[in-house]
């Protein structure tokens, strides 16, 4: 009986240590993610909140989704957008585009349904158009209202 009690106590200690380790890993991960988000916010500010990417997106959203030829004056915003993204760490580019999308949704536009899906597809593929890594930035459930 004493052997069972000792074994049970040892098992409880191991479980408690495992829980403490998992908790520490969660806290460490959360702190690292918060520090990374802060670094990305600073990079966004240095890159003017991706203002040219927003202008490019705005122009794209004003055009028909079936238009095949780009409008005159649109490509400079695209190349400036690429320069702004290139000025950010690779690890912050997608987070920066997500921040830009949330800002556009909250401050400038109120896209819904298909318009929101189109806007997200455009933003997801901006790195690819710029030939930057990562080539695609999934927006998925990270944007409110989608």
UniProtKB/Swiss-Prot annotation:
The keyword Hydrolase does not apply. InterPro entries: Bifun_inhib/LTP/seed_sf, Bifunc_inhib/LTP/seed_store, Napin/2SS/CON. Gene3D superfamilies: Plant lipid-transfer and hydrophobic proteins (1.10.110.10). Disulfide bonds join 40-92, 53-81, 82-130, 94-137. Keywords: Allergen, Disulfide bond, Pyrrolidone carboxylic acid, Seed storage protein, Signal, Storage protein. SUPFAM superfamilies: Bifunctional inhibitor/lipid-transfer protein/seed storage 2S albumin (SSF47699). CDD domains: AAI_SS. Pfam families: Tryp_alpha_amyl (PF00234). Residues 1-22 form the signal peptide. The keyword DNA repair does not apply. GO terms for molecular function: nutrient reservoir activity. The modification Pyrrolidone carboxylic acid is found at residue 37. Changing residue 91 to E: In variant 1A. Belongs to the 2S seed storage albumins family. This is 2S sulfur-rich seed storage protein 1. It comes from Bertholletia excelsa (Brazil nut).
